[in-house]
Amino acid sequence: GRSYALVELVDLAPTLLEAAGLPPAPGMQGRSLAPLLRDDGGRDQHRDDVYCEYYNALDRPAEPPQHSTMVRTRRHKLVLHHSTNEGELYDLREDPGENANRWESAAHAQIKTGLLIQLANRMAWTVDPLPVRATPQLEG
């Protein structure tokens, strides 16, 4: 069957490891998709949102370098272009083709603020946790 769960590319490695009977490596940020594949109930529930980062990946570098992040829920998608302080906000239920950018809409200001907070949280939790840092022991 088909699932409409929100998933990320980082979920693939933990899924393959679980299928091979191996534990995820320390610091892996993905979540195994195995429950979705087994259809353990919540077939359409995996994540509340998905996160994406874009760092100047065009075939021709731009100035200033392009740096954008995105958070998407089932209902909304918010893209923040950090290099220009511009953004995009779409209501995916009302506008699945993403044609009407609501970034500047006063009627969507509360949704925008909530998604910006959600984006900031995802950015904070997505920082590379490795290598594990040790506190040096001081002799004294």
Task: Give the location of each predicted region.
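C-terminal cap/loop subdomain of S1 sulfatases and analogous C-terminal strand-loop tails that border
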Residues: 10-13, 18-88, 92, 97, ...
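A short, structured beta-strand-centered segment in the mid-to-C-terminal lobe
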Residues: 1-9
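Short alpha-helix boundary/capping segments
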Residues: 4, 103-107
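Short small-residue beta-strand/loop micro-motif enriched in glycine and branched aliphatics
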Residues: 1, 97-101
